[in-house]
Design a protein with these regions (language model features):
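Bacterial Sec-dependent N-terminal signal peptides
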Residues: 1-22
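N-terminal maturation segment of proteins
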Residues: 19-425
């Protein structure tokens, strides 16, 4: 009897091994396909740290072979569906489903890159897996009126906000020191809860002529290059928000945990490819924004800014509490970028109208509003990941977690696994 049971166990393990091998081959096909699309669409691949053997061997064609890619996507999705239906493993089903979600985004991005038009809602649903709530003009007016009561002084709400914020503008010659200090402290906070690989590190560079404020270029092997755009003025809160978002416990930590736990420990080859326009980005951006508040609860953020960052920047600490109170209210206006993206993509709003919305309802200066328009024109519905992605991640992490330590633990689970968007809702 023992021999028979042992024989059955061998058969089971053998069957599981064959199934896993088949899924691995599909995962390799997914990576090859993504890298080949990336030969044409320079924004398609955000990071890749897998084997060189999966990179394209042939030079790209003179024209974008959209139909070829769409056909390959369709075949691969069908193969994944078949593999999932035959599998008795919940982990394998989830893995196949996660890759399929990514491939749905591949399909939409290929269509966008080839010039096919779609509405904002279809695009956001296919790329990021969500239906994005609409925020009316009345919504923004309500919070503007609330801010008007909070901000004292003459002039418009925008002028009053700018008068307050300019007190906390970081001098250009202090940016390096302030940001490196913020990143180092963010790492300390994160290391209290996550075991970080000894070899991990982030470098910091300052750049110009970009449509974004900060970017994490993940290099693989637990290394990142963080870039901060200095085209526009950088205020003191951004030293924490951007630095933490891009590094600890944001993008750098998200990528290294996936690499360690899935690619290196489990051999999930698909995780070595990070396609920018995919459901993975909703979790990446949402978790990076949520992680700022986790590492810097309001009281700690205020104390660290007041006692450490402002003195380093050579700035007066008077008014910082009121400034942070206003910024907390102003967060409610972040959805304005979604509505501007919706209007521009759907053709119901001109760039000039979009800029007016950003200045009026987002309390953005004209240079920042113009830079935001540039971002939307390039990245389109991607903007929803920063705010609606944050909402979904916050709901996921804070459900049934009563303490900060429990939230850190659930947050770590989110950053270490192939979590599908449906699991967040």
């Amino acid at each position: 009897m023992k021999r028979f049971i042992f024989f059955l166990a061998i058969l089971f393990v053998g069957h599981e091994g064959i199934a896993q091998s088949q899924l691995n081959r599909l995962a390799e096909a997914y990576v090859r396909l993504g890298l080949e699309i990336g030969q044409y669409d320079s924004d398609f691949v955000d990071a890749y740290y897998g084997p060189d053997s999966l990179k394209p061997k042939k030079a790209k064609l003179d024209s974008f072979p959209s139909q070829k890619f769409l056909d390959q996507i369709s075949v691969l999705r069908l193969q994944l569906k078949t593999r999932a239906e035959k599998s008795g493993s919940a982990e394998e089903k989830n893995r196949a489903g996660w890759i399929d979600d990514q491939l749905r985004a591949f399909e939409r991005r290929v269509k966008i890159f080839s010039g096919e038009k779609s509405d904002f809602d279809t695009e956001a649903r296919d790329l990021f897996g969500v239906d994005v709530p609409v925020h009316s003009e009345a919504y923004f007016t309500y919070y503007l009126e609330t801010l008007e009561k909070t901000l004292s002084g003459p002039g418009s709400v925008l002028n009053r906000f700018q008068d307050l914020s300019k007190k906390f503008l970081i001098p250009k010659n202090k940016l390096d020191t302030v940001f490196k200090t913020a990143i180092a402290f963010s790492r300390e906070q994160t290391a209290k809860h996550f075991k970080l690989p000894p070899s991990e590190y982030c470098t910091l560079d300052f750049v110009k002529n970009k449509s974004w404020g900060g970017y994490n270029w993940y290099q693989g092997r637990y290394r990142s290059k963080v870039e901060i755009n200095t085209d526009l003025n950088i205020f003191i809160e951004r030293a924490i928000d951007v630095a933490s978002h891009e590094s600890y416990p944001g993008h750098h930590v998200y990528n290294l945990l996936l690499e360690k736990n899935l690619y290196r420990d489990k051999g999930y080859i698909e995780i070595s490819l990070y396609p920018l326009f995919s459901p993975q980005s909703l979790i990446a951006e949402g978790s990076a924004n949520y992680g700022v508040g986790l590492a810097f609860p309001d009281s700690l953020k205020l104390a660290f800014t007041k006692n450490v960052l402002l003195p380093l920047a050579g700035l007066d600490t008077n008014g910082i509490t009121a400034y942070y109170d206003v910024l907390k209210l102003k967060e409610k206006l972040n959805y304005v970028r979604n509505e501007v993206a919706r209007g521009l993509i759907n053709g119901t709003m001109t760039e000039a109208e979009g800029q007016r919305w950003l200045e009026t309802y987002g309390l953005m200066s004209t240079p920042i509003a113009k830079k935001s328009i540039d971002f939307i024109k390039k990245y389109r519905s991607y903007v929803i990941n920063y705010n609606y992605g944050l909402d979904l991640v916050a709901k996921y992490v804070q459900t049934n977690t009563g303490t900060a330590e429990q939230r850190w633990k659930k947050f770590g689970k989110l950053l270490s696994n192939e979590v599908r968007i449906g699991d967040l809702k």
